[in-house]
Design a protein with these regions (language model features):
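Catalytic core and acceptor-binding pocket of nucleotide-sugar-dependent glycosyltransferases
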Residues: 156-271
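Residues that flank catalytic or metal-binding motifs in active/ligand-binding sites
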Residues: 34, 50, 86, 107, ...
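N-terminal anchoring/stem segment of glycosyltransferases
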Residues: 1-70, 97-100, 163, 241-246, ...
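Conserved catalytic core of nucleotide-sugar-dependent glycosyltransferases
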Residues: 117-189
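Short, P/G- and charge-enriched loop/turn segments at secondary-structure junctions
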Residues: 73-78, 142-149, 223-226
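Short, hydrophobic beta-strand segments that form beta-sheet elements in well-ordered domains
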Residues: 35-43, 103-107, 111, 128-132, ...
Length: 271
Protein backbone atom coordinates (compact mmCIF):
# COMPACT_ATOMS: atom_id res chain seq x y z
CA UNK A 1 0.00 0.00 0.00
CA UNK A 2 1.22 3.49 -0.80
CA UNK A 3 1.33 5.65 2.35
CA UNK A 4 1.53 9.43 1.91
CA UNK A 5 2.36 11.37 5.08
CA UNK A 6 1.41 15.05 4.76
CA UNK A 7 2.13 18.08 6.93
CA UNK A 8 2.14 21.87 6.56
CA UNK A 9 4.44 24.62 7.83
CA UNK A 10 4.21 28.38 7.47
CA UNK A 11 5.64 31.34 9.35
CA UNK A 12 8.37 30.97 11.98
CA UNK A 13 6.65 29.22 14.88
CA UNK A 14 7.91 25.80 13.79
CA UNK A 15 11.42 25.38 12.44
CA UNK A 16 12.39 22.84 9.78
CA UNK A 17 13.50 20.38 12.47
CA UNK A 18 9.82 19.83 13.37
CA UNK A 19 9.19 18.62 9.82
CA UNK A 20 12.35 16.52 9.62
CA UNK A 21 11.66 14.82 12.95
CA UNK A 22 8.04 14.15 11.98
CA UNK A 23 9.27 12.46 8.81
CA UNK A 24 11.74 10.36 10.81
CA UNK A 25 9.10 9.29 13.33
CA UNK A 26 6.60 8.42 10.61
CA UNK A 27 9.13 6.38 8.66
CA UNK A 28 10.32 4.48 11.75
CA UNK A 29 6.75 3.60 12.67
CA UNK A 30 5.52 2.67 9.17
CA UNK A 31 5.91 -0.96 8.13
CA UNK A 32 8.57 -1.49 5.45
CA UNK A 33 6.09 -3.30 3.23
CA UNK A 34 4.39 0.03 2.52
CA UNK A 35 5.51 2.47 -0.18
CA UNK A 36 6.37 5.46 2.04
CA UNK A 37 6.26 9.09 0.85
CA UNK A 38 6.45 12.31 2.86
CA UNK A 39 5.05 15.69 1.72
CA UNK A 40 5.25 19.14 3.27
CA UNK A 41 3.21 22.17 2.23
CA UNK A 42 5.27 25.24 3.05
CA UNK A 43 6.17 28.83 2.22
CA UNK A 44 9.83 28.21 3.15
CA UNK A 45 11.58 24.92 2.37
CA UNK A 46 14.98 25.94 3.78
CA UNK A 47 16.38 23.29 6.10
CA UNK A 48 14.05 20.47 5.07
CA UNK A 49 15.63 17.08 4.42
CA UNK A 50 16.17 16.34 0.71
CA UNK A 51 13.88 13.29 0.70
CA UNK A 52 10.88 15.43 1.68
CA UNK A 53 8.57 16.21 -1.24
CA UNK A 54 7.90 19.94 -0.94
CA UNK A 55 4.59 21.39 -2.12
CA UNK A 56 4.67 25.20 -2.19
CA UNK A 57 1.35 26.54 -0.95
CA UNK A 58 -0.79 27.18 -4.04
CA UNK A 59 -1.29 30.91 -4.53
CA UNK A 60 -4.99 31.04 -3.72
CA UNK A 61 -6.33 34.33 -2.30
CA UNK A 62 -7.24 34.27 1.40
CA UNK A 63 -5.96 30.70 1.85
CA UNK A 64 -2.25 31.08 1.13
CA UNK A 65 -0.70 32.51 4.34
CA UNK A 66 0.62 35.62 2.58
CA UNK A 67 -2.94 36.96 2.18
CA UNK A 68 -3.83 36.95 5.87
CA UNK A 69 -0.90 35.97 8.10
CA UNK A 70 0.18 39.15 9.89
CA UNK A 71 -2.71 41.25 8.57
CA UNK A 72 -5.42 43.06 10.51
CA UNK A 73 -8.02 40.34 9.86
CA UNK A 74 -7.55 38.94 13.35
CA UNK A 75 -9.75 38.06 16.32
CA UNK A 76 -8.17 38.25 19.80
CA UNK A 77 -4.75 38.44 18.16
CA UNK A 78 -5.33 35.39 15.94
CA UNK A 79 -6.45 35.24 12.34
CA UNK A 80 -10.01 34.11 11.79
CA UNK A 81 -9.73 30.37 11.16
CA UNK A 82 -6.00 30.82 11.69
CA UNK A 83 -4.95 27.39 10.35
CA UNK A 84 -6.87 27.62 7.07
CA UNK A 85 -3.87 26.56 4.89
CA UNK A 86 -4.31 23.06 6.30
CA UNK A 87 -7.45 22.68 4.18
CA UNK A 88 -5.21 22.35 1.11
CA UNK A 89 -3.97 18.94 2.22
CA UNK A 90 -7.25 17.31 1.21
CA UNK A 91 -6.38 18.02 -2.42
CA UNK A 92 -2.84 16.63 -2.25
CA UNK A 93 -3.62 14.04 -4.92
CA UNK A 94 -3.93 16.99 -7.32
CA UNK A 95 -1.47 19.53 -5.85
CA UNK A 96 1.56 17.23 -5.57
CA UNK A 97 3.66 16.90 -8.72
CA UNK A 98 3.53 13.09 -8.67
CA UNK A 99 -0.29 12.99 -8.24
CA UNK A 100 -0.19 10.42 -5.42
CA UNK A 101 -2.89 7.86 -4.66
CA UNK A 102 -3.36 5.47 -1.74
CA UNK A 103 -3.63 6.31 1.95
CA UNK A 104 -3.03 9.88 3.10
CA UNK A 105 -2.13 10.67 6.71
CA UNK A 106 -1.99 14.30 7.80
CA UNK A 107 -0.05 15.04 10.99
CA UNK A 108 0.30 18.36 12.78
CA UNK A 109 3.91 19.31 13.43
CA UNK A 110 3.40 19.23 17.21
CA UNK A 111 2.77 15.48 17.27
CA UNK A 112 5.02 12.75 18.62
CA UNK A 113 4.62 9.31 17.06
CA UNK A 114 5.33 6.68 19.70
CA UNK A 115 4.22 3.42 18.09
CA UNK A 116 3.38 1.65 14.83
CA UNK A 117 0.94 3.70 12.72
CA UNK A 118 -0.59 0.60 11.09
CA UNK A 119 -3.81 0.89 13.16
CA UNK A 120 -4.24 4.45 11.84
CA UNK A 121 -3.88 3.21 8.27
CA UNK A 122 -6.34 0.34 8.55
CA UNK A 123 -8.91 1.45 11.15
CA UNK A 124 -11.56 2.50 8.61
CA UNK A 125 -10.75 2.23 4.91
CA UNK A 126 -14.27 3.30 3.92
CA UNK A 127 -14.44 6.74 5.58
CA UNK A 128 -12.02 9.56 6.39
CA UNK A 129 -11.04 9.26 10.05
CA UNK A 130 -9.51 11.69 12.54
CA UNK A 131 -8.84 12.12 16.23
CA UNK A 132 -11.56 13.16 18.63
CA UNK A 133 -10.88 15.12 21.81
CA UNK A 134 -11.81 12.25 24.12
CA UNK A 135 -10.12 14.09 27.00
CA UNK A 136 -12.66 16.90 26.73
CA UNK A 137 -15.52 17.26 29.23
CA UNK A 138 -18.60 16.29 27.14
CA UNK A 139 -21.10 18.25 29.22
CA UNK A 140 -20.40 21.74 27.79
CA UNK A 141 -20.83 20.31 24.28
CA UNK A 142 -24.54 19.93 24.96
CA UNK A 143 -25.03 23.59 25.82
CA UNK A 144 -26.48 26.31 23.65
CA UNK A 145 -23.32 28.40 24.14
CA UNK A 146 -21.13 25.64 22.69
CA UNK A 147 -23.37 25.28 19.66
CA UNK A 148 -23.61 29.02 19.03
CA UNK A 149 -19.81 29.29 19.22
CA UNK A 150 -19.38 26.27 16.93
CA UNK A 151 -17.09 24.71 19.51
CA UNK A 152 -14.71 21.94 18.47
CA UNK A 153 -14.83 18.35 19.68
CA UNK A 154 -12.52 16.91 17.02
CA UNK A 155 -8.74 17.18 16.95
CA UNK A 156 -6.96 17.68 13.63
CA UNK A 157 -3.54 16.48 14.78
CA UNK A 158 -4.08 13.28 12.77
CA UNK A 159 -6.45 12.87 9.82
CA UNK A 160 -6.50 9.84 7.49
CA UNK A 161 -8.24 9.23 4.17
CA UNK A 162 -7.84 7.37 0.87
CA UNK A 163 -7.36 8.81 -2.62
CA UNK A 164 -9.95 11.57 -3.19
CA UNK A 165 -12.24 10.68 -0.24
CA UNK A 166 -11.74 14.11 1.35
CA UNK A 167 -11.58 16.26 -1.79
CA UNK A 168 -15.13 17.42 -1.04
CA UNK A 169 -13.67 19.40 1.89
CA UNK A 170 -11.37 21.32 -0.42
CA UNK A 171 -14.18 22.10 -2.85
CA UNK A 172 -16.36 23.33 0.01
CA UNK A 173 -13.57 25.66 1.16
CA UNK A 174 -13.10 27.06 -2.34
CA UNK A 175 -16.80 27.69 -2.81
CA UNK A 176 -17.64 29.00 0.67
CA UNK A 177 -14.42 30.27 2.20
CA UNK A 178 -15.61 33.73 3.28
CA UNK A 179 -18.53 32.19 5.16
CA UNK A 180 -16.28 29.49 6.64
CA UNK A 181 -13.58 31.88 7.93
CA UNK A 182 -16.15 34.07 9.68
CA UNK A 183 -18.32 31.25 11.02
CA UNK A 184 -15.62 28.92 12.33
CA UNK A 185 -13.35 31.68 13.60
CA UNK A 186 -11.28 29.62 16.04
CA UNK A 187 -9.84 27.12 13.57
CA UNK A 188 -10.41 24.22 11.23
CA UNK A 189 -11.23 21.82 14.09
CA UNK A 190 -14.40 23.87 14.59
CA UNK A 191 -15.11 23.72 10.86
CA UNK A 192 -14.66 19.95 10.69
CA UNK A 193 -16.72 19.39 13.85
CA UNK A 194 -19.75 21.23 12.50
CA UNK A 195 -19.57 21.12 8.73
CA UNK A 196 -18.38 17.53 8.38
CA UNK A 197 -18.93 16.00 11.82
CA UNK A 198 -21.80 14.60 13.85
CA UNK A 199 -23.92 17.75 13.40
CA UNK A 200 -23.04 18.16 9.73
CA UNK A 201 -22.55 15.84 6.79
CA UNK A 202 -21.07 13.05 8.93
CA UNK A 203 -18.03 12.60 6.72
CA UNK A 204 -15.60 11.88 9.56
CA UNK A 205 -15.24 8.74 11.63
CA UNK A 206 -13.09 8.99 14.77
CA UNK A 207 -10.23 6.93 16.14
CA UNK A 208 -10.75 5.26 19.54
CA UNK A 209 -9.64 6.96 22.74
CA UNK A 210 -6.66 4.65 23.23
CA UNK A 211 -4.96 5.71 19.96
CA UNK A 212 -3.76 9.11 21.19
CA UNK A 213 -3.45 11.32 24.24
CA UNK A 214 -2.84 14.97 24.94
CA UNK A 215 0.23 15.76 27.03
CA UNK A 216 -1.61 18.82 28.40
CA UNK A 217 -5.13 17.37 28.74
CA UNK A 218 -4.87 13.63 29.41
CA UNK A 219 -6.34 10.75 27.41
CA UNK A 220 -10.02 10.06 28.17
CA UNK A 221 -12.73 11.81 30.17
CA UNK A 222 -14.91 8.69 30.25
CA UNK A 223 -12.04 6.53 31.52
CA UNK A 224 -11.03 9.17 34.10
CA UNK A 225 -7.55 9.21 32.59
CA UNK A 226 -6.83 12.93 32.72
CA UNK A 227 -3.45 13.25 34.41
CA UNK A 228 -1.37 15.76 32.48
CA UNK A 229 2.31 16.06 31.61
CA UNK A 230 3.01 12.32 31.83
CA UNK A 231 4.21 9.80 29.26
CA UNK A 232 1.76 7.05 28.31
CA UNK A 233 3.52 4.13 26.70
CA UNK A 234 0.83 2.38 24.67
CA UNK A 235 -0.95 5.07 22.55
CA UNK A 236 0.25 5.68 19.01
CA UNK A 237 0.36 9.47 19.27
CA UNK A 238 1.01 12.22 21.78
CA UNK A 239 -0.35 15.66 20.87
CA UNK A 240 0.51 19.03 22.38
CA UNK A 241 -2.61 21.17 22.22
CA UNK A 242 -2.44 24.18 24.52
CA UNK A 243 -4.69 27.13 25.34
CA UNK A 244 -3.88 30.11 23.15
CA UNK A 245 -5.80 32.77 25.09
CA UNK A 246 -5.59 33.60 28.83
CA UNK A 247 -9.36 33.30 29.31
CA UNK A 248 -9.27 29.72 27.97
CA UNK A 249 -6.75 28.48 30.52
CA UNK A 250 -8.38 26.20 33.06
CA UNK A 251 -7.06 24.67 36.27
CA UNK A 252 -5.62 21.22 35.75
CA UNK A 253 -4.52 21.78 32.18
CA UNK A 254 -0.89 21.63 31.21
CA UNK A 255 0.82 24.21 29.05
CA UNK A 256 3.95 22.43 27.83
CA UNK A 257 4.97 23.17 24.26
CA UNK A 258 6.77 20.48 22.35
CA UNK A 259 10.00 22.45 22.09
CA UNK A 260 9.97 22.86 25.90
CA UNK A 261 9.65 19.13 26.53
CA UNK A 262 12.04 17.54 29.05
CA UNK A 263 10.40 14.11 29.44
CA UNK A 264 13.15 11.65 28.45
CA UNK A 265 10.73 8.94 27.29
CA UNK A 266 9.00 11.26 24.83
CA UNK A 267 12.25 12.85 23.72
CA UNK A 268 13.47 9.38 22.68
CA UNK A 269 10.67 9.32 20.12
CA UNK A 270 10.94 12.95 18.99
CA UNK A 271 14.04 12.69 16.83
Amino acid sequence: MRVNIVCSKWGTRYGPHFVNRLKNMARRNCNDRHDFHFYCYTDDADGLDPDIKVIPFPDIPDIHPKYWFGTDNFKYGMARCWDRPKTMVFNTHNFADDKPTGRFVFFDLDVIIQNDIEPLLTYNMERPTKLRSWWQDPRPMKTRKFKLAHGAYTNGSCQVWSDDQAECIWHDVLENQEKIWFTYTDGTDNYHSWRWGDWGKKLWDHFPADYAYSYNRGRSWDDDDLETEIYRETPILCVFNIDLLPEQMLKGRGSVKQNELVDPELLKHWQ
